[in-house]
């Protein structure tokens, strides 16, 4: 094998020390410990500076933005909730006013229709009263006409009956008196 890659015992140049002993783990070697500690300190300081100056401000700004956005969203939600509550109150107020107006319009319409129907009823009653009076006059006139015709018919019938039964022609004046007396008795 090539030099530095190992020997027959499997030891390598990196791990074998003089005298055939294995060398300690490189970070624990006494002669390189101080330089490794300085390197660690430099790396830690560099990492600390990078993290504190670059990474943490970015993370902090993201967290601040997120917190601000949450606060803004919460404030907007509160504002919108207030607006929706106000809108709901306004809607309920408008609805109550609309109901009141509808009831007032309904009552007014009902009163107007009742008044109109009452006026129409009175007008119809007056017309019916006039027609009834006219009908009563017509009936009275028809009755008088009929009664005058009845008197004539009764006189003719009585004359015919007397003539049929007795064979004599009755006296007109006596017949008229008898018919008048009979008709007056039936009207009373």
Swiss-Prot record:
- Sequence ranges of Low complexity compositional bias: 8-18
Keywords of the record, alphabetical order, are: ATP synthesis, Cell inner membrane, Cell membrane, CF(0), Hydrogen ion transport, Ion transport, Membrane, Transmembrane, Transmembrane helix, Transport
Is 4Fe-4S among the key words of this record? Answer: no
> Positions of the region Disordered?
1-23
Question: Which InterPro entries does this entry report, sorted A to Z?
Answer: ATP_synth_b/b'su_bac/chlpt, ATP_synthase_B_chain
Q: How does it sit in the membrane?
A: Single-pass membrane protein
- Signal sequence extent: none
Its Gene Ontology molecular function terms? proton-transporting ATP synthase activity, rotational mechanism; proton-transporting ATPase activity, rotational mechanism
> What is the annotated role of this protein in its UniProt record?
F(1)F(0) ATP synthase produces ATP from ADP in the presence of a proton or sodium gradient. F-type ATPases consist of two structural domains, F(1) containing the extramembraneous catalytic core and F(0) containing the membrane proton channel, linked together by a central stalk and a peripheral stalk. During catalysis, ATP synthesis in the catalytic domain of F(1) is coupled via a rotary mechanism of the central stalk subunits to proton translocation.
HAMAP family the record matches: ATP_synth_b_bprime
- Please give the subunit comment from the record: F-type ATPases have 2 components, F(1) - the catalytic core - and F(0) - the membrane proton channel. F(1) has five subunits: alpha(3), beta(3), gamma(1), delta(1), epsilon(1). F(0) has three main subunits: a(1), b(2) and c(10-14). The alpha and beta chains form an alternating ring which encloses part of the gamma chain. F(1) is attached to F(0) by a central stalk formed by the gamma and epsilon chains, while a peripheral stalk is formed by the delta and b chains.
Task: Tell me what this protein is called.
Answer: ATP synthase subunit b 2
Q: Which organism is it from?
A: Rhodopseudomonas palustris (strain BisB18)
């Amino acid at each position: 094998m090539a030099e530095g890659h190992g020997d027959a015992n499997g030891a390598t140049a990196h791990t074998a020390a003089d005298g055939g002993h294995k060398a300690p783990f490189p970070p624990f070697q006494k002669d390189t410990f101080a330089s490794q500690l300085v390197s660690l300190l430099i790396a830690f300081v560099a990492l600390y500076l990078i993290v504190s100056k670059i990474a943490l401000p970015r993370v902090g700004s993201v967290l601040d933005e997120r917190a601000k956005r949450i606060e803004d969203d919460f404030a907007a939600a509160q504002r919108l909730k207030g607006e929706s509550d106000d809108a709901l109150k306004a809607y309920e107020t408008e609805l109550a006013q609309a109901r009141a107006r509808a009831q007032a319009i309904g009552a007014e319409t009902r009163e107007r229709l009742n008044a109109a129907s009452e006026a129409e009823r009175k007008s119809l009653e007056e017309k019916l009263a006039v027609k009834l009076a006219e009908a009563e006059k017509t009936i009275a006139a028809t009755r008088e006409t009929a009664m005058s015709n009845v008197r004539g018919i009764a006189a003719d019938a009585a004359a015919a009956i007397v003539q049929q039964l007795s064979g004599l022609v009755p006296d007109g004046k006596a017949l008229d008196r008898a018919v008048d007396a009979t008709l007056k008795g039936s009207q009373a």
